[in-house]
Amino acid sequence: MNILIAADSFKGSCSARQVTDTIERAAKNVIPDVTITKIPVADGGEGTVDALVAAMKGTKVSVPAHDPLGRPITAEYGLLPDGSAVIETAAASGLTLLKPEERDALHASTFGTGELIRHALEHRVKKIILGLGGSATTDGGAGLAGALGISFLDKDGKELEPGGVQQQSRLAAGHDGII
């Protein structure tokens, strides 16, 4: 008997890989001689890099970055054999990086995701596949853009602090430092 196991993560508890491994163990307990093919899948959030790297025989790159609240972390993105990078917003800007009491979308930033993109661009990737699921932020990518050299200014020309939707007074953008 052949069984295909294609599963996504269980938010906040198990990665797609953990889910497929658990189902495999359970199936083998019931049908010891079963042949199993596991395919972790993802919806663009957590597990997207793992799924694409596994399916396409890619590798992972670890990069110093910042979490949604600006704390230093190490985050990963994937490199595929065709020269593409796979980056999850969730890797550096995700809900799972925060304790429940820290979750504050109005002050969280996507700056860390921009750091991953910047690293990939500096290493000459040919294409970036960006998964947008699992974000802890509402900054509309302003933090991400900031990490790439774009500044956001208020009506008086002063640079705005990073953050979420509370920065609605943005009226102009500067791009002098863009890579």
Predicted regions, residues:
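Structural motif
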Residues: N2-L4, T59-S62, G83-I87, K126-I129, ...
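Glycine/threonine-rich beta-strand-loop-alpha-helix active-site module
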Residues: H107-F111, E115-R118, E122-G131, A136-I179
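Anion-binding (especially nucleotide phosphate/pyrophosphate-binding) glycine-rich loop
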Residues: P72-A136
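Glycine-rich, flexible loop/turn motifs
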Residues: A6, T35, V61, I73, ...
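Solvent-exposed, flexible loop/coil residues
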Residues: C14, A65, L69, Y77, ...
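Conserved active-site and cofactor/substrate-binding residues in soluble primary-metabolism enzymes
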Residues: C14, Q18, T22, D43-G47, ...
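N-terminal phosphate-binding or glycine-rich loops at protein starts, especially the Walker A/P-loop
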Residues: M1-V53, G143-G146, Q167
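Glycine-rich nucleotide/cofactor/substrate-binding loop typically near the N-terminus or early
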Residues: R25-L97
